[in-house]
């Protein structure tokens, strides 16, 4: 019997029993029985089925795996995660995610004004919000408003102009400044289909020289105390973990040097996304497990902090597809 690679991509979320594809949960309903029930209600055309329990499972797996690695290596920093809203902004996905993530302080990542408004509206107060992407004055002002609402928000600047806008808004509004993060443009690139979105030739992030310029600008405007995070992203859906290790070492050294310069409140490294899931039905394309991923992140950052004599940083991830991909099934009529 052809199982269409379900043993490769399903991660036990779906199984084949008695010749039927079934949801591996509670009474194990078959997909075809779900479809028949929906058709009886006179719904036509393709169907998009969502399974919130799978989203909940992925959130728990991500946090439990990283927290287990933290315990194993006696790591002093904490693990934190935010969900990138660009992956899925629909209410029937976001509401279960917010509810399940509350116990972990799971947050949201926004890359546009619309996404930031969603995060400000639905994120659990106290859970982190990170802001990436292009930011004009209006979006940065929204970040200040989010801070005034009590949100734990970090605006991650990708160019010196964004830092200049933060200073401008701060001077105009006299509002409390949000946390500031620096996206660094590493020499290390990623692996897989989206590898070019990271590395030294990427259009995103600050070079080493620009990082120093940004630090001096923050010093001149009394903003160093708001610098809490450095961020990198070496590409989505990495099929190998080796490039991540290089990026962790490079970013770890930048973190340590900034700490030694005087950025005393800098306490976090955001490793971006990149955690892959299997899409292939014929062979495995991801050559690492989540446990290996977490162990390498924890071990590498602990080692660098020890070498440099600085505090072990808190760790942030922005994994999207790992959390969301498996929970949605598209079913189409066969012509």
Where are these regions (language model features)?
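Glycine-rich tight-turn/loop motif centered on a GG-T
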Residues: 44, 102-103, 126-129, 148-154, ...
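C-terminal active-site-proximal or functional interface alpha/beta core segments in diverse enzymes
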Residues: 44, 236-335
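Short acidic, glycine/serine/threonine-rich loops at helix termini
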Residues: 93-96, 120-123, 140-145, 166-170, ...
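A charged N-terminal "starter" segment
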Residues: 1-179, 212, 216, 220-222, ...
